[in-house]
UniProtKB/Swiss-Prot annotation:
GO terms for molecular function: actin filament binding; Arp2/3 complex binding; ATP binding; hydrolase activity; microfilament motor activity. ATP binds at G133, E134, S135, G136, A137, G138, K139, T140. Residues 719-739, 740-765 form the IQ domain. GO terms for cellular component: actin cortical patch; cell cortex of cell tip; mating projection tip; medial cortex; myosin I complex; plasma membrane raft; prospore membrane. Residues 1-33, 948-1066, 1122-1196 are annotated as: Disordered. It comes from the Eukaryota. It is found in: Cytoplasm, Cytoskeleton, Actin patch. It comes from Chaetomium globosum (strain ATCC 6205 / CBS 148.51 / DSM 1962 / NBRC 6347 / NRRL 1970) (Soil fungus). This is Myosin-1.
Length: 1214
C-alpha cells in the first residue's frame, strides 16, 4: 500500500524530520596519533602562501625528497616520478582509499581513480582520466595504477564474465607494453604509442567490457635506434626467451644476430627482466583469449621482421642493388610464404606510375633497396600492432548493456631531441591538443561558464595555445600538415623537391609562434621551442608503401599476412591517399571529441631529472615543466573559482533527500522550481551562503569540503532511515519490556507486601486476642520485616555483629532488634540493661556490646538458647513490652526481656518452632529468677508516663488498646504523576495508554492589572529598600505545611547594592624632628620638619621610611609618629521608598535581623525508625538514634544505661 501525503501533516512532518535526520554522534575522545606522518610542505598547492612557479617548485622538491610524490591542485593530481618503488601501491594502501573522498586521505593516484569511479556511479556521467607530461615522467605507471584500482573496487565477485573482463583489462598492460614500449635515453619503459582505454560499466558499476584506441605508433624504431636505446621490448623478449620450437621453426637466435636489435649496442636494461616479461606477455595473450595459432602467427611475423633486417644489399656491375646472402632471402620467403624471386623483385625493382598512366619499372640502388626493405619491416610491425589492438578489443567487447564508462588516456609525452622530425612533430601536436583540452576544460571553460552563469569572481589571465594548434592543423590558412600535403602533390616523385617546396611554404607563413630557419623551422610549443628538420619530413608524411611491396603481400600464401594487410591494391588509382599527418589529425580530433563528452580528471606528471635517479631533483628542468604545464595558472584559478558546479535539475536529483521539504520516504515531493529546491536544500543542510552561488542554470559550490559534506550526508541518509526504524523498533521493545517490568514490579510489590501483611495478621492470632495493644502496633503502614539490624547482610554493622556471634553459614536470622534484659544487682533492685536480641532458625541469642581495649566496641555473646529448649514464653495481658523465656536451666535463671517488637518476634518464633511454641498470656509474667525458683512479676497500670518501666518487682504501664484490636487500613500514598514509559523521544507521552497525568496541579491565576494599577505603573515608582523588603517578608506568617509558589511573571526587586570595599589600611606618617644625613646607601637623608611614611618598624632603633618614591632606613629617635586621620563615617543608607499613595514614608529605625520564617526553613530530615531500643520508662530503652557502627551502638548503650539510672522519661508511644 502506497504512502498518502496529506497537506495538513506536511508542516508537522517537516518539523519532526528536520531535527532527527542528522544522526550525529558524540565525538570520540581525542587521542594523539603517533602513527600519523608529519606533512611535508603542503599537500595541495592551493594552500601555498605565495603562488609562483618558484614556490610550487620548492614545495614539490620538499615532498620529492621526503618520498611524497603526489600533490593536489584542487582535483588535479601532480605526480613526480620517484624512479624507485615506494611501496605505496599495495592492496592494503588500495583498500584504505576505497570509499574515501579526496580530503580524507593523502594525495594519491588511487584517490583520483576513486573519485572518477564514484562520480560515474553517483552522477551517471562518463569519466576520463587525462595523464599528461613529458616522456619518462610516469604516465604509463599512473595509467596502470588506475586500472589496478578500478579492477579491485568495481565488484563483480571472483568468477564470471565480470571478473574475466577485469583480468583481461589488466592483461592489456603487459601485452601492449611489450609491443609498444621501448627503452629510450630518458625512460627505460617509454610508451612509443598513444593509448586510450575505455572501460564500460553496467548500471551497478561493474565492468562489462572495454575498448582500446591506439595513436601513432613510432614504427621507425623498428628499423633503427640511436646508441643506448632499444627496439620494442618484444624483440628482446622473443629472442631471449623463445621456446625451442620457435627457434627451430622461425630460426630465432640471440638479439646480437639481428641488425634491427644490435645496431644500438644495447641489449639489457637495468630493472627489466626480458625473460620474465616474456612469460608475462604469453600469459597476457592467454588471458585475453589469443589461440595458440594466433600466437604462432604473431611470432612468425616478428621473426620475419627480424630476418628482413638481415637482408643486406651490394652493388652489382651496373650499380644497382643485389642481395648479398641468398639464404636470408630464402628463409624470409619461407616465413612470409612468398616466392623468393618475387621477394627480391619487390624490394630491388621500383614501380613508377606517371600521370600519363604508363607503368615504369626502375632498378633500385643500394640505398633505395635498403629503404624499401625497412618500409616492408615497418609496415608489417605497424599493421601487426593494429591487429593485436583490434583482437584485444574483440575479446573485451561488452557482454552486457553498458551504462557509463571511464577512459584512461596514456599518450606519449612532449619530446624535444637534438634532431626532431615528423615523429616529434606529430607527438608534440597531440600534446598541444591535450593541453588545449586542459585549458578549455579547466581554465577558459571555467571562466566562460562563470561569465555565462553570472557568477561573481575574479578573472585570471592565462595563455591559450589554440594559436599553436591552428598553426599545425589549419587548412585555411594552410598549416604545417597542409603545407606538407601540398608539397607532396607538387613534387611527389622527388622527396628532396618535396622538402624544398615545403620549406618555401614555411617561409611564406606569418605566425608569431613559427620561426623559419635554413633547412629547418622552429615552433614555439607550450612546453618550449622545438627545432624541426625539414630533410625527409615530407616523405615520412606521405607514408606510402610501394605497389610492388603491396603486390608481394597480396600474393602471399599466409592467410594471417592478408589479415594484417586488409586493404586491396588498386593498380589504376592515382588519387593521393591520406597522409600520415591527415591520419594523426583525424585521430587527435576524434580523441578530443571523445574527451569533451566526459567529465575529466587530470594527472600532470613531472620528471625530476634526466638520469633516472631516485635522489636527484633538477630544479631548472622541473621549473620548466611547471611553466609549460601551466600549474601556476591552475592554482590561481582554483583558488578563485568553484570546485563543483551542476545544473539545478541534476543537483536536486542528487541531493533532494537531504531536505525534509523536498523529500519524504525517498520520494521527491517539492512542487516548486528546481532553483527554489536547490536553495531549500542548501538552507536545510546549513551550508553557509559564502560557500555557494546560484547561476542562471547551475548551482556552484566553492570548496570541495562542502561537496564532500553533502555527499557524506547523502550517504548517511539511508543509514539514518534504517537507524530510525531500528530506534523505533528498539523503543517498542523497550516499551514492551518496561511494561512487563512494571507489571512484575507491581506484582512483586503486592506479593511481598501481602507476605508481610500476612505475617502481621498472624501476629494478631498469635496473641489470641488476650493482650492489650499499643497504638503504634496497629498502624496501617506497619509491616513485619524481621531482620531489622541486617544480621543476614554481607556488609555493615549487622555483618560485623554476625561475625562476632560466629553464626554458621546455614544459620539465618529471622528477627533482630535492640532490646533490654533485666539484670539482678547484688544488694539492690534489678535494673534493665541494653542488649541485642537475635532469633535465627535454630537459636535465640542475647548479645551485649561492651567497650574493649582502645575504646573499640566488642560483641559479647551473653546467652543463647536452642529454640527447642524454650519451654514457654510468658507475657502479660497489658500493653507492656516485657516477656520471659522459660528455659528451665539448672545453672542459670530465665531471662526477662523487653522488646518493642515483641508481637513480631513471637510471630517469627512460631514460624520456626512448628509444634513447640507455647505462649503464656496472663496477669503476671512468670520466670525463674534463680535456677529452679519461679517468680511472678506483677503488671500495674499506674505509670505516670506513657512508657512502661520496671521497679521493685513490678512493671508499671498504662491502659492500652483493646485486645481484639486489628491493624488499620493501609494509608494511600501521595498521588504522583505517572512516570513516562520510555526516555528520550517518548512513545507514550504520559502514563499507561498515553493519557495525561491526572494529578491536580495548583495554578494560581494571575490577576489582570486594573486601570489604577496600570496608571500607577506608567510612571517610575520608587522600589523598597532590600532590607526593608526582607524585613517585611519575614514579618508575614506563612503556614509551615504550605509551599510558596514562585511567580516568574512578577517584577523582581532590584538586587541589593554590593558591600563596600574594606577601607584601605591607613599609612603611618611621621614628622622628622632632627636632620639626618645618610652615610650608607641603605640610609635615607631627612631634614627637620619633613613628613615621611613609615613602611616598617624594627626593634633595633631603625625604621624603614619612604620619601619621594625612594625608601631606606632612618633612626627611630629622629622622627615622631603622627596620629592617623580618623576613618570617614560610612555613607547613610538611601531613604525608604515612598508610600503607595504617593506620600513620603517616615524613616523607620532599622529592624533587628528577622528569624527565618517557618515556611522558608528546610524541614528536618526524618530519622529512620530505630527498632533496636525498647520503650521502657527510662531513656536507656527509648534512644532512637540510628547506629551506623558498632562503636555507635556501644556508645548508645552506655548512654542509655546512664539515663536509665537517672530515671529519665521519654515521650515515645509504641
Amino acid at each position: 500500500m502506497g504512502i498518502t501525503r496529506r497537506a495538513k501533516d506536511k508542516a508537522a512532518r517537516a518539523e519532526r524530520s528536520g531535527g532527527g535526520g542528522g544522526g550525529s554522534s558524540k565525538p570520540k575522545k581525542a587521542t594523539f596519533d603517533t602513527t600519523k606522518k608529519k606533512e611535508i610542505g603542503v599537500s595541495d598547492l592551493t594552500l601555498l602562501r605565495t603562488v609562483s612557479n618558484e614556490a610550487i617548485n620548492e614545495n614539490l622538491k620538499k615532498r620529492f625528497e621526503g618520498a611524497e610524490i603526489y600533490t593536489y591542485i584542487g582535483h588535479v593530481l601532480v605526480s613526480v616520478n620517484p624512479f624507485r618503488d615506494l611501496g605505496i601501491y599495495t592492496d592494503q594502501v588500495l583498500d584504505s582509499y576505497r570509499g574515501k573522498n579526496r580530503l580524507e586521505m593523502p594525495p594519491h593516484v588511487f584517490a583520483i581513480a576513486e573519485s572518477a569511479y564514484y562520480n560515474m556511479k553517483a552522477y551517471k556521467e562518463n569519466q576520463c582520466v587525462i595523464i599528461s607530461g613529458e616522456s619518462g615522467a610516469g604516465k604509463t605507471e599512473a595509467a596502470k595504477r588506475i586500472m589496478q584500482y578500478i579492477a579491485n573496487v568495481s565488484g563483480g565477485g571472483e568468477t564470471g564474465d565480470i571478473q574475466q573482463i577485469k583480468d583481461m583489462v589488466l592483461a592489456t598492460n603487459p601485452l601492449l607494453e611489450s609491443f609498444g614500449n621501448a627503452k629510450t635515453l630518458r625512460n627505460n619503459n617509454s610508451s612509443r604509442f598513444g593509448k586510450y582505454l575505455q572501460i564500460h560499466f553496467n548500471a551497478q558499476g561493474e565492468p562489462v567490457g572495454a575498448d582500446i584506441t591506439n595513436y601513432l605508433l613510432e614504427k621507425s624504431r623498428v628499423v633503427g635506434q640511436i646508441v643506448n636505446e632499444r627496439n620494442f621490448h618484444i624483440f628482446y623478449q622473443f629472442t631471449k626467451g623463445a621456446s625451442q620450437h620457435y627457434r627451430e621453426t622461425f630460426g630465432i637466435q640471440k638479439p646480437e644476430t639481428y641488425i634491427y636489435t644490435s645496431r644500438s649496442k644495447c641489449f639489457n636494461v637495468d630493472g627489466i627482466d626480458d625473460l620474465a616479461e616474456y612469460q608475462d606477455t604469453l600469459n597476457a595473450m592467454k588471458v585475453i583469449g589469443l589461440s595458440q595459432a594466433e600466437q604462432d602467427n604473431i611470432f612468425r611475423m616478428l621473426a620475419a621482421i627480424l630476418w628482413t633486417g638481415n637482408l643486406v644489399f651490394r652493388e652489382d656491375d651496373n650499380g644497382y642493388a643485389a642481395v648479398s646472402d641468398q639464404s636470408v632471402v630464402d628463409f624470409l620467403a619461407y616465413l612470409l610464404e612468398v616466392d623468393p624471386a618475387r621477394l627480391v623483385h619487390a624490394i630491388t625493382i621500383r614501380v613508377l606510375t606517371p600521370r600519363n598512366g604508363e607503368v615504369i619499372e626502375s632498378p633500385a640502388n643500394v640505398a633505395q633497396a635498403t629503404a624499401t626493405r625497412d618500409a616492408l619491416a615497418k609496415a608489417i610491425y605497424y599493421n601487426l600492432f593494429d591487429w593485436i589492438v583490434e583482437r584485444v578489443n574483440q575479446s573485451l567487447r561488452a557482454r552486457q548493456a553498458a551504462a557509463n564508462s571511464i577512459g584512461i588516456l596514456d599518450i606519449y609525452g612532449f619530446e624535444i631531441f637534438e634532431k626532431n622530425s615528423f615523429e616529434q612533430l606529430c607527438i608534440n601536436y597531440v600534446n598541444e591538443k591535450l593541453q588545449q583540452i586542459f585549458i578549455q576544460l579547466t581554465l577558459k571553460a571555467e571562466q566562460d561558464e562563470y561569465a555565462r552563469e553570472q557568477i561573481k569572481w575574479t578573472p585570471i589571465s592565462y595563455f591559450d595555445n589554440k594559436i599553436v594548434c591552428d598553426l599545425i592543423e589549419s587548412v585555411r590558412p594552410p598549416g604545417v600538415f597542409s603545407a606538407m600535403k601540398d608539397a607532396t602533390k607538387t613534387a611527389h616523385a622527388d622527396p628532396a623537391a618535396c622538402d624544398r617546396t615545403f620549406m618555401q611554404s614555411i617561409n611564406g607563413m606569418s605566425n608569431p609562434h613559427l620561426t623559419p630557419r635554413q633547412g629547418n623551422f622552429i615552433i614555439k610549443h607550450y612546453a618550449g621551442d622545438v627545432t624541426y628538420t625539414v630533410d625527409g619530413i615530407t616523405d615520412k608524411n606521405k607514408d606510402q608503401l610501394l605497389k610492388g611491396i603491396l603486390n608481394l603481400v597480396q600474393g602471399s600464401q599466409n592467410k594471417f599476412l592478408h589479415d594484417i594487410f586488409p586493404q586491396q591494391v588498386d593498380q589504376d588509382n592515382r588519387k593521393q591517399p591520406p597522409s600520415a599527418g591527415d591520419r594523426i589529425k583525424t585521430s587527435a580530433n576524434a580523441l578530443v571529441e571523445t574527451l569533451m563528452k566526459c567529465q575529466p580528471s587530470y594527472i600532470r606528471t613531472i620528471k625530476p631529472n634526466e638520469n633516472k635517479s631516485p635522489t636527484e631533483y633538477n630544479v631548472p628542468n622541473v621549473l620548466h615543466q611547471i611553466k609549460y604545464l601551466g600549474l601556476q595558472e591552475n592554482v590561481r584559478i582554483r583558488r578563485a573559482g568553484f570546485a563543483y558546479r551542476q545544473s539545478f535539475e541534476k543537483f536536486v536529483d542528487r541531493f533532494f533527500l537531504l531536505s525534509p521539504a523536498t523529500s519524504y520516504a525517498g520520494e521527491y515531493t517539492w512542487q516548486g522550481s528546481y532553483e527554489a529546491a536547490v536553495k531549500q536544500i542548501l538552507k536545510d543542510t546549513s551550508i553557509p551562503q559564502e560557500e555557494w552561488q546560484l547561476g542562471v542554470t547551475k548551482a556552484f559550490i566553492k570548496s570541495p569540503e562542502t561537496l564532500f559534506a553533502l555527499e557524506h550526508m547523502r550517504d548517511r541518509y539511508w543509514h539514518n532511515m534504517a537507524t530510525r526504524i531500528q530506534r523505533m523498533w528498539r523503543a517498542y521493545l523497550a516499551y514492551r519490556a518496561e511494561s512487563a517490568t512494571r507489571i512484575q514490579r507491581f506484582w512483586r510489590k503486592k506479593r511481598t507486601g501481602a507476605e508481610y501483611l500476612q505475617l502481621r495478621d498472624d501476629g494478631h492470632r498469635v496473641l489470641q486476642g488476650r493482650k492489650e495493644r499499643r497504638r503504634m502496633s496497629i498502624l496501617g503502614s506497619r509491616r513485619f520485616l524481621g531482620d531489622y539490624l541486617g544480621i543476614n547482610a554481607s556488609t555493615g554493622p549487622g555483618a560485623q555483629m554476625r561475625n562476632g556471634m560466629q553464626l554458621g553459614n546455614n544459620e539465618r536470622a529471622v528477627f533482630s532488634c535492640r532490646g533490654e534484659v533485666l539484670e539482678a544487682k547484688f544488694g539492690r533492685s534489678s535494673k534493665p540493661s541494653p542488649r541485642t536480641i537475635v532469633v535465627t532458625n535454630n537459636k535465640f541469642y542475647v548479645v551485649a556490646l561492651v567497650m574493649g581495649q582502645n575504646n573499640q566496641p566488642q560483641v559479647i555473646l551473653e546467652r543463647s538458647f536452642p529454640l527447642g529448649a524454650i519451654k514457654f514464653i510468658s507475657t502479660s495481658t497489658a500493653r507492656d513490652d516485657w516477656f520471659s523465656l522459660g528455659v528451665g536451666s539448672q545453672q542459670e535463671a530465665d531471662p526477662l526481656l523487653n522488646c518493642v517488637l515483641k508481637t513480631e518476634m513471637f510471630t517469627q518464633m512460631k514460624r520456626v518452632m512448628p509444634g513447640g511454641f507455647n505462649l503464656k498470656i496472663g496477669d503476671t509474667i512468670e520466670y525463674a529468677k534463680k535456677p529452679g525458683k519461679m517468680q511472678l512479676v506483677k503488671v500495674l497500670k499506674d505509670a505516670p508516663t506513657p512508657h512502661d518501666f520496671y521497679k521493685s518487682g513490678a512493671v508499671h504501664t498504662q491502659q492500652g488498646e483493646p485486645p481484639n484490636s486489628v491493624s488499620r487500613p493501609t494509608p494511600k500514598g501521595k498521588p504522583v504523576p505517572p512516570r513516562p514509559i520510555t526516555r528520550g523521544k517518548l512513545i507514550k507521552p504520559g502514563g499507561p495508554g498515553g493519557r495525561p497525568s491526572r494529578v491536580p496541579v495548583n495554578r494560581t491565576p494571575q490577576p489582570r492589572p486594573s486601570g489604577a494599577s496600570a496608571a500607577t505603573t506608567s510612571r517610575p515608582v520608587p522600589q523598597p529598600h532590600p532590607a526593608a523588603a526582607a524585613a517585611a517578608a519575614a514579618s508575614v506568617s506563612i503556614p509551615s505545611h504550605t509551599r510558596q509558589k514562585s511567580n516568574s511573571s512578577a517584577v523582581r526587586a532590584p538586587p541589593p547594592p554590593p558591600p563596600a570595599a574594606p577601607p584601605a589600611k591607613p599609612k603611618i606618617m611621621a614628622k622628622v624632628l632632627y636632620d639626618f644625613a645618610g652615610q650608607r646607601e641603605n640610609e635615607l637623608s631627612i631634614q627637620a620638619g619633613q613628613v615621611i611614611e613609615i613602611v616598617q618598624k624594627e626593634n633595633n632603633g631603625w625604621w624603614l621610611a619612604k620619601l619621594s618614591g625612594g625608601q631606606a632606613w632612618v633612626p627611630a629617635a629622629y622622627v615622631e609618629e603622627q596620629e592617623a586621620a580618623p576613618v570617614p563615617a560610612p555613607r547613610p543608607p538611601p531613604p525608604p521608598p515612598a508610600a503607595a499613595n504617593g506620600a513620603r514614608a517616615k524613616p523607620a529605625a532599622p529592624q533587628p535581623p528577622a528569624k527565618r520564617p517557618a515556611a522558608g526553613r528546610k524541614p528536618a530530615a526524618l530519622q529512620g525508625r530505630d527498632s533496636a531500643m525498647s520503650m521502657n520508662g527510662s531513656d536507656s530503652s527509648r534512644s532512637s538514634t540510628p547506629t551506623p557502627s558498632l562503636g555507635g551502638s556501644l556508645a548508645d548503650a552506655l548512654l542509655a544505661r546512664k539515663n536509665a539510672m537517672a530515671k529519665k522519661d521519654d515521650d515515645d508511644d509504641w
